[in-house]
């Protein structure tokens, strides 16, 4: 019943099949390099199962997380780079995986992040959330070169439209999100929510300014068997803060391959350019 903290360290391994039971937070990695977490189970963490802040070279393998309280996210990364997540099971009562730039005392871009071969189950909020928090003082932080591949999403249940989306890129705080791929994703059930949510916005609850834009996004080989899904959303903010160059390739909803935005059930709003379906 305690938190493991890696603060300003290098070349650390946290290994084994032990359990962290009801910690305030599971594992914290801050201002560190080359940290491996492998085999740990975290049960009912009050907040993050694993948080990464302004760190480089984090690898998380074969981790299992179960949580039931609000704010008990799974894996959250703020201003991190060169991150690999492989073979994790996350059943969380908030975002399963969230990727931001600046938050708290962490600053800088988030890039080169790869999530593979994993299972996500979100009680509320998002299975996957990218964007939201950044640095409006500098206005130059970027989230880029991010890949989610071979992922099973078992559930998404969120009643607030602003926080819906199994696969969400929702930039605020002058963030720019680019070069992001979702590939081989299987969504089993959506109790309440959206499949895709791409938005440049100014969330006055969490942001101090709007995002800068979203571009070069690929959704490939995505299937969903959920029957009661709210329309997905694609929405820019203004002519200088757009969503552009988004590819939907081989999207299958309830056994039918999608050939149009209408079939994809997407609400395409203003300041959106170059949306393609293959």
Report the location of each language-model feature.
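Extracellular/periplasmic carbohydrate-active domains that bind, remodel
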Residues: 1-278
């Amino acid at each position: 019943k305690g938190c493991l903290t890696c603060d300003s360290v290098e070349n650390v391994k946290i290994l084994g099949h032990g359990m962290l039971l009801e910690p305030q937070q599971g594992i914290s990695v801050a201002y560190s390099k080359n940290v491996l977490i492998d085999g740990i189970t975290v049960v009912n963490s009050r907040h993050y199962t694993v948080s990464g802040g302004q760190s480089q070279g984090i690898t998380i393998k074969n981790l299992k997380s179960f949580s039931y309280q609000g704010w008990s996210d799974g894996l959250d990364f703020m201003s991190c780079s060169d991150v690999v997540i492989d073979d994790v099971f996350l059943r969380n009562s908030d975002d399963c995986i969230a990727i931001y730039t600046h938050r708290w005392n962490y600053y800088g871009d988030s890039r080169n992040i790869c999530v593979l071969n994993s299972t996500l189950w979100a009680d509320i909020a998002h299975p996957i959330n990218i964007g939201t928090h950044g640095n409006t003082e500098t206005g130059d932080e970027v989230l880029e070169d991010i890949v989610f591949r071979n992922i099973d999403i078992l559930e998404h249940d969120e009643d607030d439209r602003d926080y819906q989306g199994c696969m969400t890129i929702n930039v605020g705080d002058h963030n720019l999100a680019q070069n992001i791929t979702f590939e081989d994703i299987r969504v089993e059930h959506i109790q309440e929510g959206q499949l895709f949510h791409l938005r440049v916005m100014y969330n006055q609850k969490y942001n101090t300014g709007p995002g800068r834009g979203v571009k070069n996004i690929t959704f490939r080989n995505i299937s969903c068997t959920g029957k009661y899904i709210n329309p997905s959303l694609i929405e820019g903010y203004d002519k200088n803060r757009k969503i552009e160059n988004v590819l939907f390739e081989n999207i299958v909803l309830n056994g039918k391959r999608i050939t149009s935005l209408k079939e994809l059930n997407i609400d395409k709003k203003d300041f959106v350019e170059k949306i393609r379906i293959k």
